[in-house]
């Protein structure tokens, strides 16, 4: 099961609308909609907040491919940050 499907399932299990979940996570309803439709992914901080809110781990939220992609993107951002500090 992919992240978008898991998020929607968890939200519905709690009986929340996208708007209600958005308020709990301090994001827009549009962000929730994009995440649930697979048109976008939350950043790592939002993923941590989602996991905490639903009492699951980040690993449980992501498929192995999604976790790998997220790790690679995080590494690129870190490298970019260090590059900017050095130069």
Across the structure, where does each feature detected by a protein language model lie?
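Hydrophobic alpha-helical bundles in membrane proteins
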Residues: 73-87
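Short C-terminal boundary/hinge segments that cap the last helix of small helical domains
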Residues: 55-77
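Hydrophobic micro-packing sites on short alpha-helices
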Residues: 42, 46-54, 60-62
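Recognition helix of helix-turn-helix/homeodomain-like DNA-binding domains
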Residues: 25-41, 63
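Short coil turns linking two alpha-helices in DNA-binding domains
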Residues: 17, 28-31, 43, 57
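Alpha-helical residues within the helix-turn-helix
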Residues: 12, 23, 34, 52
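Short basic helix-loop element that most often maps to the first helix and adjoining turn
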Residues: 5-20
């Amino acid at each position: 099961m992919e992240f978008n499907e898991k998020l929607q399932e968890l939200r519905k299990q709690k009986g929340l609308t996208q708007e209600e979940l958005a308020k709990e996570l301090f994001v827009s309803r549009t962000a929730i909609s994009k995440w649930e439709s697979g048109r976008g992914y939350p950043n790592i901080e939002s993923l941590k907040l989602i996991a905490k809110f639903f009492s699951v781990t980040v690993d449980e939220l992501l498929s192995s491919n999604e976790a790998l992609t997220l790790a690679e993107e995080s590494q690129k951002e870190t490298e970019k940050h260090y590059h900017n500090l050095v130069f």
